[in-house]
Amino acid sequence: MIALFAAALFVAGGTARACDTALLLAVDVSNSVDEAEYRLQIDGMADALLDPEIVLALTEGRVTLSVMQWSGVERQVMSLPWRQMLTKADVIRFSQDARALERAFVLSDTAPAEAIRFALRQFDEVEDCARHIIDVSGDGTPNSGSDTRGASQEAERAGVTINGIAIESMGVAISGFYRRALVTRDGFVITARGHRDYPRAIRIKILREVSRVVG
């Protein structure tokens, strides 16, 4: 979740180009997410990237994307490394690769603080970008790991924005936790009413994030 940077950027293929935004999409694959819900998240993300408005904003803004999966304390992995979206073909290829991702972890806890800290380290590869954003999706509150608010404050000190998609389920108030402890002060939360609402929510969120790049 980030916008505006103009500098030499890491791109697939090793070429340095100007980039406005580095956006890291962090997908929750903890124990509360079953296989069908995982597919809803992955397919929803892949579909959202192909939305014509989002394709235009990504390419005009020279946005650089990556995808990570996260769950417990030592359960984070970069599933798709940083790639810059210079053309529609770049976006289509990234969407296809995202849709093909296999789930990285199963039967694991929920540790968003450790996910945030892992994500922060990834921005070393795109440090010249003007704005850095972590886009966290999840359907649960922490049951392992360190204090989430502390990790969010570390992101603020590093100049990184955290936005969130809170996937609500019956009797679990995820949106309030995200607003209180996870997103940064310049960030925002989009609520998905269950995993089936996730495709709508992620489209809105990505469009809001990358549209800031092109006005």
PLM features per residue range, with description:
Residues 63-98, 174-180:
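Short beta-strand-loop
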Residues 14-18:
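Sec/Tat signal peptide C-region and signal peptidase I cleavage site
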Residues 43-54, 103, 120-128, 142, ...:
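Sec-exported extracytoplasmic/periplasmic mature domains
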Residues 19-81, 85, 92-137, 163-174, 197, ...:
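Von Willebrand factor
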Residues 26-36, 65, 81, 99-109, ...:
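Second-shell loop/turn segments in exported
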Residues 140-180:
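VWA/integrin I-like adhesion module and closely mimicked acidic/polar interface patches used
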